[in-house]
Amino acid sequence: VLEFPDLQGIAGAHYARHDGELESVATAVEEHYWPRFSGDQLPSSPEASAVALADRLDTLVGIFGIGQAPTGSKDPFALRRGAVAVIRLLVDLDTQLNLSDLAERAAQEYPNDTLAPDTAAAVTNYTLDRFRSWYEDQNIAVEVLRAVLATGITGPAEVNRRVSALNAFAGTEAAIALAAANKRVANILNKSGQARAGIP
């Protein structure tokens, strides 16, 4: 939308109502562009959220698939904003939907050999990495997010639940005692020459 971007989706909603579409359809036409920027409101209905999610994932997979992923400060297709929107939508829906599965499903809509190999995995990793800035805005340490992502889960709602729980635990005396005990065990193992277990 190059002219009147503030009206994006609004005209479509009016057309949908004029054509006799259900109100839920008209609402989804308007609200699937939400959130439009950081901190913007989310869609008010499951239908609008579903379309918003599908639209963002299609864009991410399509642009990544042709090798136009953001680099450095360049993000001409606003993919960072789109990825954060995907996270916010999935967390808000509080669903068990798996980001990896959703990216794979979006990639399947493209003809064979259209996308670069591992496009879905690249989109998944990129989107999960956007959690970092999202949590920084909430003053949650990046180490908390890394600890959660080290478990291999890719469902944003589950990631958010675990980050919230771990962040709450991290400030307790029990967490401090656990960290101290872990450090002592690591020092003992290092001095004895034994390899540490693969614990992140």
Across the structure, where does each feature detected by a protein language model lie?
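Amphipathic alpha-helical "coupling" segments that flank catalytic cores
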Residues: 1-200
